[in-house]
């Protein structure tokens, strides 16, 4: 067991009282596969419906929104009908705290509920760079979790590198995790976790049942070799997939692509990462 896992094992022990519930969550059905639409941000602006049709054609089960709704920005029911027609589900939505502030909460939640979206995730907040800021965010996430629960919705937080600065077990991410209830989703972006020099597998294991949605992204640390496509980089995708299946309670594995090597187009790069992910999912060692 490496140092990272040893240190995080101590964090996991602190959640022992939640073990039964986490185990039940971890025994959920096989994770569905979605794509974060930020991955195709240029193509979707040029042809919204056509890009979604191509995503469906690749075999994705869902899409995670990033505040881009094309011709449907005022018509969530129309967008829901379009998704249904193409057998796509809403895997979640990225947004900011201010969209859930008093005065905007009702309109925001009504839009996403009509869209069939139950998972709302804060995409980033500059306060995540510090322990103090993360503690404050934890309080806000806790309040939002309580307010969203009666609507059948959840709140989550998505990391960048800033949340993983510091000693293992004492990062801003750990502060957010410990300061929020089990119902709050820890949407680990494994690309940013590895970029920050931390082990994404250990963090799934440290907080059982909290990785209900996760971003599978290949992102190379500075000075490392490889290609930023799932299966062509250095990430141990087999171990990570096994962890989200066995421990994370993961409902959605969401591919996110932010780098497009060798002149590849955005959708073509997403397709390449999907191919790599399918190979990982089929590996018996990833069970």
Predicted segments with their positions:
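Hydrophobic faces of well-ordered beta-strands that scaffold small-molecule active sites
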Residues: 31-36, 63-65, 90-95, 120-122, ...
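Bacterial N-terminal signal peptides
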Residues: 10-20
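Active-site acidic/histidine proton-transfer and metal-coordination neighborhood
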Residues: 53, 82, 89, 97-185, ...
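Acidic/histidine-rich catalytic cores of soluble enzymes
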Residues: 150-234
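Aromatic-rich peripheral "rim/lid" segments of glycoside hydrolase catalytic domains that contact
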Residues: 260-287
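Bacterial N-terminal signal peptides that target proteins for export
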Residues: 2-12
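Acidic-and-aromatic substrate-binding clefts and catalytic sites of carbohydrate-active enzymes
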Residues: 40-46, 65-75, 96-104, 126-135, ...
């Amino acid at each position: 067991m490496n140092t990272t896992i040893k240190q995080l094992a101590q964090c996991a022990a602190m959640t022992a009282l939640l073990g039964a519930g986490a185990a039940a969550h971890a025994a959920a059905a096989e994770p569905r596969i979605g794509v974060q639409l930020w991955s195709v941000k240029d193509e979707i602006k040029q042809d919204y419906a056509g890009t979604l049709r191509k995503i469906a054609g690749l075999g994705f089960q869902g899409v995670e929104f990033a505040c881009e709704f094309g011709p449907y920005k005022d018509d969530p029911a129309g967008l829901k009908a379009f998704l249904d027609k193409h057998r796509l589900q809403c895997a979640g939505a990225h947004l900011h705290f201010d969209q859930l502030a008093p005065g905007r909460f009702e309109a925001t939640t009504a839009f996403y509920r009509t869209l069939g979206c139950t998972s709302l995730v804060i995409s980033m907040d500059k306060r995540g760079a510090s322990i103090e800021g993360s503690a404050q965010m934890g309080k806000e996430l806790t309040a939002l979790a309580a307010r969203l629960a009666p609507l059948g919705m959840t709140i989550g937080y998505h990391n960048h590198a800033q949340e993983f600065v510091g000693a293992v077990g004492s990062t801003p991410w750990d502060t957010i995790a410990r300061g929020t209830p089990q119902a709050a989703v820890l949407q680990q972006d494994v690309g940013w976790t590895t970029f920050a020099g931390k082990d994404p597998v250990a963090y799934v294991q440290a907080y059982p049942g909290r990785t209900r949605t996760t971003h599978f992204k290949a992102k190379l640390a500075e000075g490392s070799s490889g290609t930023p496509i799932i299966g062509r980089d250095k990430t141990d995708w087999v171990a990570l997939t096994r962890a989200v299946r066995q421990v994370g309670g993961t409902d959605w594995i969401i591919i996110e692509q932010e780098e497009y090597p060798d002149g590849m187009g955005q959708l073509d790069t997403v397709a390449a990462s999907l191919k790599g992910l399918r190979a990982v999912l089929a590996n018996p060692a990833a069970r």
